Swiss-Prot record:
One of its GO terms (molecular function) is TSC1-TSC2 complex binding. Its main location: other. Keywords: Autophagy, Lipid-binding, Lysosome, Repeat, WD repeat. This is WD repeat domain phosphoinositide-interacting protein 3. A motif (L/FRRG motif) lies at residues 224-227. One of its GO terms (cellular component) is phagophore assembly site. The gene is Wdr45b. Pfam families: PROPPIN.
Length: 344
């Protein structure tokens, strides 16, 4: 969740994002960066810079390497550079410079993927990174890109050159033609892979529908309806076995859908009437909760299979528990920016 150019909450938070398995989340601040354990909530690392904002932080699971990009009012690093930070040495150990601003960075143990506004560059994760691939995209100001973290699957997904299309490339065999998915008619706003890299979920800027595709064939598996009114989708995430997804939007709600068993999702009683528009046969979330503050948030599943975590731009942390029938209760509420590492 990129909060640049300004965060209305005035708490210095510029960016928040989960690591690959959602076990941690990292925050870019106007004066450094922080790393937290997601569930249970615990501050793991706090690196403060005297002068310098960090607009993007990308973790690599729980290892000591993080990718940093400068941001905020006084960026710590130029926004056209990717800095690889070694948290054991407490310093940057790799630096990659570009001619334009960096929109996002993705890491896996052998690759650094850098997203620019109309292309994606792939490098070796070595002391002197070597450029391996360049992929063209449509204009991509949000830096949409997902990299499968599974060691047996080198799948990279990003917006194609055509509006609403998703391109899937296997970095282990780039000679194979990419899978091109015409996911939406409008501009993409969010994409997410499951941990195994077998499913991809997509949303457009309209934000009413979430679509799930098979990554090997590109076939549509499910179409899910978040709502009837347009919304800005901030985040989509699968759970560990890809049976569920959670979705957050600017309506202040987090929706939970069944990704594998469509019967669990709610459907209109008029769904079987063939003369009615497709809207009435839509599959709706079986559970949802309202973030009390209504603040922009990212969401992911917690350590318990029936838990969803919301990390909000105003510094609030919520953990909700949901039942198989969809009832939802708030379990934890905290202010993560006000924590110190010995509070929890």
């Amino acid at each position: 969740m990129n909060l640049l150019p300004c965060n209305p909450h005035g708490n210095g938070l510029l960016y928040a994002g989960f690591n690959q398995d959602h076990g941690c989340f990292a925050c870019g601040m106007e004066n450094g960066f922080r790393v937290y354990n997601t569930d249970p909530l615990k501050e793991k690392e706090k690196q403060e810079f005297l002068e310098g904002g960090v607009g993007h932080v990308e973790m690599l699971f729980r290892c000591n390497y993080l990718a940093l990009v400068g941001g905020g009012k006084k960026p710590k690093y130029p926004p056209n550079k990717v800095m690889i930070w070694d948290d054991l040495k407490k310093k940057t150990v790799i630096e990659i410079e570009f001619s334009t601003e960096v929109k996002a960075v993705k890491l896996r143990r052998d690759r650094i993927v850098v997203v620019l506004d109309s292309m994606i560059k792939v490098f070796t994760f070595t002391h002197n990174p070597h450029q391996l691939h360049v992929f063209e995209t449509c204009y991509n100001p949000k830096g949409l890109c997902v990299l499968c973290p599974n060691s047996n699957n080198s799948l990279l997904a990003f917006p194609g050159t055509h509006t609403g299309h998703v391109q899937l490339v296997d970095l282990a065999s780039t000679e194979k033609p990419p899978v091109d998915i015409p996911a939406h008619e409008g501009v993409l706003s969010c994409i997410a892979l499951n941990l195994q890299g077998t499913r991809i979920a997509t949303a457009s800027e309209k934000g009413t529908l979430i679509r799930i595709f098979d990554t090997s064939s590109g076939h549509l598996i499910q179409e899910l309806r978040r709502g009837s009114q347009a919304a800005n989708i901030y985040c989509i995430n699968f759970n560990q076995d890809a049976s569920l997804i959670c979705v957050s939007s600017d309506h202040g709600t987090v929706h939970i859908f069944a990704a594998e068993d469509p019967k669990r999702n709610k459907q209109s009683s008029l769904a079987s009437a063939s003369f009615l528009p497709k809207y009435f046969s839509s599959k709706w979330s079986f559970s949802k909760f309202q973030v009390p503050s209504g603040s922009p948030c990212i969401c992911a599943f917690g350590t318990e299979p029936n838990a969803v975590i919301a990390i909000c731009a105003d510094g609030s942390y919520y953990k909700f528990l949901f039942s198989p029938k969809g009832e939802c209760v708030r379990d934890v509420c905290a202010q993560f920016l006000e924590m110190t590492d010995d509070k929890l």
